[in-house]
Every structure is written in C-alpha cells, then in structure tokens.
Amino acid sequence: MSKVVVVGAGIGGMSAAARLAKNGHKVTVYENSDRSGGKCRTEWFGDSAFDTGPSLLTLPAVYRDLFLKTGKRIEHILNIEPVDPAFNYNFSDGKSITFPNLSNPATYLEIKKILGDDAGSGWQQIIERAERMWDVSREQFVESELNSFWPLLKNRNLVTQLREIAPFTSLRTLSNQLNLDPHLRMIVDRYATYTGSDPRSAPAVLLTIAFVESTFGAWHIKGGIGQLSVALQNRCEELGVKFEFNTRVREISVKSNRVDGILLEDNRFISSDLVVANADAEYVYNKLISKNVRSANNERRKLKKATKSLSGFSLLLGLDNYKGERARLNHHNVFFPENYDNEFEEIFNKKIPVSDPTIYICAPKDKSMVIGENKESWFVLVNAPRHEPGIGWDWTQGGEDYAKKIITKLDNLGLNVSSRLDFLKFRTPADLESYAMAPGGSIYGTSSNSAKSAFLRARNRSKTKGLFCVGGSAHPGGGLPLVGISAEIVANAIGKA
C-alpha cells in the first residue's frame, strides 16, 4: 500500500483518488477551497441554481466506467438525461440551426432544410472525417500516456494515420479544404474553443469533437453538472479517501529527485510515497515545486513554450417570467457575431475583451434548478483574454461595464433579459484565477494552438519520481471526458497497491 497525497479536489483529483483507493492505496485529498469540484460546481443564488463551470456532459461512458469499477453504477446515483435538441446555433444573418441529439441523419436533414443540400452533404463529410480521426487518435493519443513522439514512429500505419489526422493542418484550413458553408465553418471553429484555442492555428484533429458530440450525445445531470462532483466525493469517502478542505499546499517536497510529501500553509509536513497534482500544471511546476528541482525543468520549459488557453467571462442570470415574456431558448444555445475572426484576434493578439463576442447560453430545462414555475437560471459565457495585469488585460476593473454590455446585446437579440432580471452575478478571469487557482484564469491550462501542443501539456507521469499530474492542464487536456481519462491514465500508471 502506498500513501498517496492528492493536491486539489477537482474532478480529476477525485477521479484518480477513487480509482487509487479501490486499488488499495491510502489516499488523502488536500483542497484549498471549502468544497470539492474545482471548476465543476453547481451553485445556488436565491431561487436559481447555476452550473458555474462545465454545463455539458459528453462521453458519459468515462464516468460510467469509473463508478462501475469503484462501486455502485452511476445510474443508481445520478439521473443522467439526454439533452434534445443538443444545440441551437444562431447567426447574425437571422438563420438558426438546431442540432438534434444522438441522430446524425436528423442533423443532416436539418442542415439541408436551413442551408441547402450542399451544406448537408458537407456536414456529413465532416462527421465521417471526424470519425476516422477519432478512430486513429482515441487509443494511442487520448487514452494513453503521451510522453514523446518517438514511440509513435514505430507504428507501421503511422503515415496513413498522420494523413488522416492532419497534424500540421489547422481546423480552419480543413474547413476551407472541405469548402464548408460559412455557417457550418463557424460551428467547426467553435470546437477549438472547447480547448481554449484559436481555430486559425488549432490542429484539425479537434474536429473529433463533432463526432463525439453527435455520436455519443449531449447529456445533462439532473440538479446540475456539479452533482457529479458531489457523487465523486461521496464515492471517494465510501472507499476510505480522506479530505482536508480550506487547506492550502505551499510546496510539493522533493528529495533526491523523488517526492516525499507536501508542506502545507500552516507549516504541517505531510509525508507521502506519491503525489497526484490536480492543480494547474503551470502553478504546480512554477509555484509548488522548488526551482532547485532539476527534474522539473523540462516541464517548466515546455509550459513556457505553450500558448495559454483563453479564459471566460460569465454571467449568472436569475430571471422572473412574471416580469416579462419568456425567451424561447433550448438547453444549449450559441449566438455567433457577424465577424467571428475578430473574437480570436482580440483575445489572442490584442488581449482585450471581445467587442462583439459569441454568446453561449445554458438555459436548463430542469425544474430542480429553480424554485418557482416562473423562474429561470441562465449561465451565460463569452470567451475572454486571460487576466494578465501589466502585459495584457487587467480584469480587476471594468467587469460591471462589460456585464452590462453583454446584457444589452442579449436584449438586442430579442431575449428580453433586462425586464425579467431578478438576480445577476458576473465572474471575470481574475475571479477564476482566484477561486480555481488557474493562472490568468485560463480555463484549460495550455491551448491547442499548434501541432506540438499535445506534447507541451504536462505529462501524467512526471520525470520527478512519484509525482503525477491529472486534470485539464495535463494530458490529454480539458473538459470532463478528458479529465476523467487523465485520472484513469494516472491510476493505471501507479497500479495496484
């Protein structure tokens, strides 16, 4: 039995903790805040509950597997429901496309109806190409440790597979090569933002998101996606995992190139055989590990080379429909601007708040997330530059004015927000940096803005012996499915007690 310390009670940390405890290890989780979940939280304000982090569950099989292998099935604990339709996309020219859930044929028909036969055929091409990419990348890239490119060179099918995933082709370039309808190109571009990236430079393999969403579906957890955090903490505790909340880790201690424990802010030293870091990798290697630890230098250099992911500016809106007419929205809604490229230019190059942002609205059709038939809870998110005072945008100022600007745009879209507004709370990238310990408020750690980006993420198994990294800033990346896979990779690397 190994004594394992997990730094951070996010989804990745708890998923790893549950698997390791089931494998016979003694596990303790240390969390800086007063609750588990990291960015994955459902929070109540007044009469409304909001998913303040992830608001969509894809690839639920990742968590079905986790719960099945550690105890009771997830279906016995959580009510996981398909969201139908999956998405509603709205464009500045007045066109609107609704993607049905779990039905590619129905999606093709919807696209043909709105955009014409060529567009429908184009989307079918997209899904077929995305499926082939997924088949190539899933096992050897996504579900395996990815420590270097060299082992991949031994693959006999490497040339064919590289041609399929097109590692040196950007998502935007692939859209252009396929001559996609401009409306569909915007939808494809948006997949880059799922990893905090710019579609003009992010690799084409992110197209796999289209296949995963359409084939494995879009799902909601009754009561909010944050219920997954609650269920994971409960599962961990059932398996004997201990939690210490409001406990800040000051340092991961390393002696002779091997971790030997952690030093807490209250000066307690906790010895351990292994440390699983669920904090942002940039924070782990630059703040928690001494600069004198040479084995960490390679990771520091990689992280320095990587482009940081974008952040987000969010609004939590509690709406009262007795005050005005209810807007007709689906669960997941996207409103694109006229000039989508300008958004990426302002975020990544100018590093300023987007003047005319794409707006995502999560408007759950979940009665357990509001008190009162007349109430609605909307989570509104726009992409934003990181919080970087001195070299970029300082998000400690101007948040209220930017929130008002977004509400005005929502009103101009005919969504009747101002007259129905019962509650408003906004969160800036600076807030995200503060409560999630995410440098600059980056949602996904590093972006995927180059062909080498996958190799610039933190390795799951560090060169510092006994140290493992899990979560959105480590391989294979951000988002609930990948974070769950990250935890499985780490648990398998550590093995049974």
Summary of predicted features, one role per range:
Residues 162-171, 214-234, 394-402:
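Short beta-strand to alpha-helix junction loop
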Residues 220, 250-372:
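Mid-domain catalytic core of redox enzymes
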Residues 320-429, 433:
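C-terminal segments that line or cap access tunnels to active or ligand-binding sites in enzymes
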Residues 208-259:
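Helical element adjacent to the flavin cofactor pocket in flavoenzyme catalytic cores
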Residues 2-136, 448:
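N-terminal glycine-rich phosphate/pyrophosphate-binding loop and immediately adjacent elements
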Residues 181-195, 356-362, 416-476:
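A glycine-rich dinucleotide-binding beta-alpha-beta segment and adjacent secondary-structure elements
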Residues 92-202:
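Rossmann-like flavin
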Residues 54, 472-494:
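A conserved FAD-binding loop/helix module that cradles the flavin
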